[in-house]
């Protein structure tokens, strides 16, 4: 992501350190550019990065569902948001956070990212001080402010856990659904029941400190939990009624050809990726990974593996239809 934007700060009234902290506090992109440049200076940010930043930093949003294409920094922004909260939370506000992935080992990798930056990131240590706590293992860590972060796998036990009387303030379900754990109707039902009967009751419910859930992922099955949340959201939006979840949903490229993150996934790059999927008969997998369209191939009326793709323009001439490019005009016959 590109250079940090300039902000309207009176440089004569604040120290250099205060200016940096004020910049970092504005949004997750600025925080990342200043303190996590390895991840945030590779490409210019897109509008959706700021949209996601606003969602994850809004303390009034307690049920967030973030559905983004593969490779579009959703997990990176979520980890950045947790670091932001750990460093900027006011004195006395403690976090008890569970990062949940499909397998616990995957969740461990994500909290290791946070541990590494807390431990050895010189900029964070200079501006905020040492945040390391007394417990520092691969599966969990604490901070010097009394926060606790643990790694869990999908379907693992969450209820009954607390940190000094505090139940979970945030539970992050990151890529918790996969093609493997959503293969059968029973497994899909088990995941839905686990979220509602295990994850939900594990949250802190004290007034003013209610816990939140972040669902983060790409839709992997048409009957997945993420898909059901999105379907409910679209119905509620259509009917103009309130919905329990705040939903953020994007495709890598929309129906009008607009690219979500043009500086990193250009239209040509996405076309090349699509072609590689098509060349091995997996066009539906591109739709799943980059368009968040998980399809029921067995019952689909139009089979994606039977589709043929043409780089032509559609033209109508003398009551006949053609697919036309610079080399040829192919007649198109439509039978209804």
What label would you give each PLM region?
Residues 100-155:
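Conserved nucleotide-state-sensing and coupling region of NTP-binding domains
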């Amino acid at each position: 992501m590109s250079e940090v934007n300039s902000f309207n700060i009176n440089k004569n009234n604040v120290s250099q350190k205060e200016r940096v902290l004020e910049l970092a506090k504005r949004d997750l992109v600025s925080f990342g550019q200043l303190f996590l440049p390895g991840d945030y200076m590779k490409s210019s940010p897109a509008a959706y990065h700021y949209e996601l930043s606003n969602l994850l930093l809004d303390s009034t949003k307690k049920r967030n569902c973030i559905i983004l294409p593969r490779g579009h920094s959703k997990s990176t922004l979520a980890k950045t948001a947790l670091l932001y909260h750990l460093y900027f939370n006011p004195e006395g506000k403690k976090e008890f956070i569970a990062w949940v992935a499909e397998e616990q080992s995957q969740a461990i990798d994500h909290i290791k990212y946070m541990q590494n930056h807390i431990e050895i990131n010189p900029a964070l240590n200079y501006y905020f001080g040492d945040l390391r706590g007394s417990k520092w293992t691969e599966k969990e860590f604490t901070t010097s402010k009394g926060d606790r972060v643990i790694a869990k796998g999908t379907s693992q036990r969450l209820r009954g856990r607390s940190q000094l009387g505090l139940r979970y303030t945030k539970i992050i379900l990151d890529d918790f659904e996969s093609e493997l754990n959503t293969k059968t109707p029973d497994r899909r039902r088990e995941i839905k029941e686990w979220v509602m009967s295990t994850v939900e009751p594990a949250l802190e419910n004290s007034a003013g400190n209610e816990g939140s859930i972040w669902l983060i992922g790409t839709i992997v099955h048409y009957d997945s939990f993420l898909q059901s949340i999105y379907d409910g959201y679209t119905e509620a939006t259509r009917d103009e009624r309130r919905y329990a979840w705040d939903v953020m949903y994007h495709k890598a490229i929309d129906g009008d050809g607009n690219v979500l993150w043009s500086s990193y996934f250009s239209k040509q790059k996405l076309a090349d990726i699509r072609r590689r999927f098509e060349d091995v008969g997996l066009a539906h997998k591109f739709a799943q990974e980059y368009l968040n369209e998980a399809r029921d191939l067995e019952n689909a009326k139009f089979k994606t593996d039977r589709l043929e793709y043409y780089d032509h323009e559609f033209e109508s001439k003398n009551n006949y239809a053609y697919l036309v490019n610079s080399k040829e005009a192919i007649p198109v016959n439509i039978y209804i």
